[in-house]
Amino acid sequence: MTITKQCVGIDISQDSFAACICFSESSQTLHFGETKHFKNDKSGFNQLVRWVRKQCEASVETVYLMEATGVYYERLAHHLHKLKQTVHVVLPNTSKHYFSSLNIKTKTDALDAKVLSQFGVERRHKVWQPPSPILLELRNLTRFYVQLQETKTALGNIMHSKESAHEVQSVILKSNRSLIKSIDKQIEVCKANIKKLISEEPGLNAKVKKVLTIKGVGLITVATIIAETLGFEHFHSIKQVVSYAGYDVVERQSGTSIKGKTRISKKGNRYIRNILYFPAMVSCRFNPELKTTYLRIIQNKPSKMVGQVAIQRKLLALIYTLWKNDSEYIEEYKKEVAPTIKAEATLDSSK
């Protein structure tokens, strides 16, 4: 038996991860080792590396493949990179298509790790590199900004209910107002820190300014999307970005008996969907091209939300296109922002 490729597939969660090794022989035959579970901490990472070294062929490169599931994969990916191991990180929707191609319907940690190891052997993937520290800092700030806004909204709802209730003590109302005022100050500080961080990085600042030429899109919106996608590093098509954000369309239909409403999956990055809500509303009113699109979509539709979501998707596609092409938005010149960008071509793994 001559091993030509070997890949460690890793299915990772908050507290633990499952690992399985797939071996490819010169005859193209695949075989799998046992699946082993480890804790998602430094001790578990070191145990994984020692286990892999015992299981794998020393003369053949060992690669590791995992999904970009939230932030849970990041510590392990960084740990392996520091040890000079080859790491591949794939988008969840990319691996989902591969799972579907194998007609796999069961879902367990062990099975996912096994299939991911096979995915790493059978397809070519881009080698993962640690994202820019600036983008990681930006993501921390933009997520904190969203959390502050959500806290303010929750406090506002409490305030409304207390003001409408019968004989609520004034100390409670005063305390709630004080909390909202404090949150407002923190929001302004967070916004200032986001602006400062971007302005201190000339390359990032220049690209952000070009994206800001889209009417209706503000700095916090662009900063959040760039931070959540880490500068679109692992994205090679608009379809991938749309799916990652949870804007991909789901349709439930079977013959003539079942025909449900078409909707977006929402199985994606909530921070992106959250931050695009208000810019889409503004664009529907003040961006001529997007307003035309919005009015066309909602024509004869009972709900305007269909049009709102379509504009959110459109804005996300525009931001992706301008960022990848390093260009500005030119109003009423559709060819400049058409989704046929030069970065569309990709490796097999991005399909």
Protein language model annotation of sequence segments:
Residues 26-59, 63:
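Nucleic-acid-processing active sites and adjacent nucleic-acid-binding tracks
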Residues 65-75:
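Acidic, metal-coordinating catalytic cores used for nucleic-acid/nucleotide bond scission
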Residues 78, 82, 88-210:
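Long, charge-rich intrinsically disordered scaffolds of nucleic-acid metabolism proteins
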Residues 212-213, 219, 224-304, 340:
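Phosphate-backbone recognition surface of nucleic-acid-processing proteins
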Residues 256-257, 294-351:
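Low-complexity, acidic/Ser/Thr- and charged residue-rich accessory regions of DNA metabolism proteins
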